[in-house]
Amino acid sequence: AARSIPVVPYGAGSGVCGGVLPTTDTVLIDMKMMRQLRHIDRARLTCDADAGMIGQHLEDDLNAAGFTLGHFPSSIYCSTLGGWIAGRSAGQCSGRYGKIEDMVLGMTVVDGTGRVLRAERGGENAALLPLFIGSEGILGVVTDARLRIAPAPPCRRFASYLFPSTETGLDAIRRIFQAGLR
């Protein structure tokens, strides 16, 4: 911080906005070794995971324990939890489980001065959560997060439908959501 040297966290490198393109005086932090699912709290339906964990690996580990995060961005195979948080990501099942900002209950961040901050929803430093979620890593490096999880569904079925017009397709989506179907 004293030398104004940029620090850029590097998760899986799937971002398309150029956020991980360092200049010659940049410190690049490779997050790949921070890739563990640390804890599942079955009673509270939460899990603690490292920010460098690839999304599909997180989902696979949760599924093996009977749970799901329910977050399925198109980049799930090549993006990290920290990247999802930094990018404020949404996924294909956001209508059912919410976006990443709805799932993050707490996180640890190292800010630009090197301070380690813990923010918990409804607790200490809660006001920091909306600042860091979607900040693209500008304000600090997310190191881990506590996430809301759900019991894994007994089965998943996917289908596609063709509608005669955009309007009828949008009307069908509206009726599905109003009926509470997800």
Predicted regions located by residue number:
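Glycine-rich N-terminal segment of FAD-binding domains in flavoprotein oxidoreductases
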Residues: 1-34
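FAD-binding subdomain of flavoenzyme oxidoreductases
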Residues: 36-182
